Curated annotation (Swiss-Prot):
MF terms (GO), sorted A to Z: 5S rRNA binding; structural constituent of ribosome
Pfam families in the cross-refs: Ribosomal_L25p, Ribosomal_TL5_C
NCBIfam families membership: bL25_bact_ctc (TIGR00731), PRK05618.1-2 (NF004128)
Keywords noted in UniProt: Ribonucleoprotein, Ribosomal protein, RNA-binding, rRNA-binding
Function per UniProt: This is one of the proteins that binds to the 5S RNA in the ribosome where it forms part of the central protuberance.
Highest taxon, organism lineage: Bacteria
Record protein name field: Large ribosomal subunit protein bL25
Keyword Ribonucleoprotein: yes
Family as reported in the entry's similarity comment: Belongs to the bacterial ribosomal protein bL25 family. CTC subfamily.
Oligomer status and interactors: Part of the 50S ribosomal subunit; part of the 5S rRNA/L5/L18/L25 subcomplex. Contacts the 5S rRNA. Binds to the 5S rRNA independently of L5 and L18.
Length: 199
């Protein structure tokens, strides 16, 4: 079951005018789409939506949508923010079954920078992908993919095959793509050159 429950109401007016009217009422307008049903214009109370956002478990996660006695599992696909105030302006929700296989972008997190063999030698981490698209059941979406840099040395290439994924979760692409490289910096190359010359 999803951790977040959003209480929604149906919006009568669509389009820009309808969205503005919804925001004037202190609510955030959105659209529910996906599956065999037609898109539905919805709204959530502003304080409730902001509270859900601040948990960090709204966007890209399984959410329970509640309208009266009806409940629906959805994925929060996108949120638009005001460029100045950073207030949420609009959101998109996608209908899913809890066990439905979906494709979704998951953030990559690198840990143990301070004890990384390669970084301690002066190497640099070149990140190729900050997110990875995974295929997984809607109720098993990982929070993030964690890569441990502790044992990685200069010259190492970190590929998706090195990451232990949860059961039932796999990369959306079949090829063994690169996520990051540990490269020699100019300073580390210079140090190695000086050492070689002295020897």
């Amino acid at each position: 079951m999803a951790e977040i429950i959003l209480n929604v109401e149906i919006r009568d007016r669509a389009g820009t005018g309808g969205s503005r009217e919804t925001r004037r009422q202190g609510k955030v307008p959105g659209v529910l789409y996906g599956g065999p049903l037609a898109p539905v214009n919805i709204a959530v109370k502003g304080n409730e939506f902001r509270k859900a956002l601040h948990t960090g478990k709204l966007l890209g996660h399984l959410v329970t949508l509640q309208h009266g006695d009806e409940k629906q599992s959805v994925i929060a696909k996108a949120v638009q923010f005001h460029p100045v105030t950073d207030e949420p302006l609009h959101f998109d929700l996608y209908r899913v079954d809890e066990h439905q296989l979906i494709k979704i972008e998951i953030p990559v997190h690198f840990k143990n920078h301070d004890i990384s063999v390669g970084l301690k030698k002066g190497g640099t981490l070149e990140i190729i992908r900050h997110t990875v698209e995974l295929a997984c059941p809607a109720d098993k979406i990982p929070e993030e993919l964690v890569i441990d840099l502790a044992s990685h040395d200069i010259g190492d290439t970190i590929r998706i095959s090195e990451i232990k994924l949860p059961e039932g979760v796999r990369p959306a692409m079949e090829r063994d793509f690169v996520i990051a490289n540990l490269k020699a910096s100019a300073a580390s190359q210079s140090t190695e050159g000086d050492t070689t010359a002295e020897a």
